[in-house]
Amino acid sequence: MDTKETQFKELFDKNSKIIYHLCYGYTGDSDSANDLMQETFIKVWQNLDGFRNQSQISTWIYRIAINTCLSYLRVEKRKVTDEISDFILENTAEPISEKEEQVSLLYKCISQLEENERIIITLVLDEVPYPEIAEISGISEGNLRVKIHRIKHRLTDIYNRYERL
């Protein structure tokens, strides 16, 4: 395997799970998230030689993923899938664990946030370091901490509204 292939394989192994979760946060759909993750890594492969080391390579990959998701949403014009998802969940033969339900509800709540809030909270959930999140989102680390605090409060409010239903 040549150097580029080896480097790409390492990047994919290290970042694919986080990129999937980031994409899932945008789409709320596993198939679309997988497609967007694949598209992201195709772009990474195509542009790997052009990476200029001006930031961490993972930051560069996150930015590609975010731009890919935003392009997708612009083209697809986000569809309301809550009713379909609920129908599928109600009619699924397999029992769903309480943890899976909570994770599903969390992503449903995240999808209610504004775009920049979705990006930030998804990266926080994927345990990306704050300095890197600040760089990706283009804000100071201090401002990031305030935003995260506010996002958590909004998520709690949204989650509590769903829990009451």
Name the predicted role of every residue range.
Residues 7-10, 105-113:
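Short amphipathic alpha-helical boundary/capping segments
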Residues 78-103, 129-130:
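Internal acidic/polar
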Residues 1-21, 34:
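A short, charge-rich alpha-helical start-of-domain segment used by transcription regulators
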Residues 21, 35-42, 55-67:
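Structural recognition of an alpha-helix C-terminal capping motif at a helix-to-coil junction
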Residues 70, 137-161:
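DNA-recognition helix of helix-turn-helix
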Residues 50-52, 63-82, 99, 150:
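Arg/Lys-rich amphipathic alpha helix in sigma70-family domain 2
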Residues 120-121:
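A short pre-motif secondary-structure segment
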Residues 2, 39-56, 75-76:
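Sigma70-family region 2
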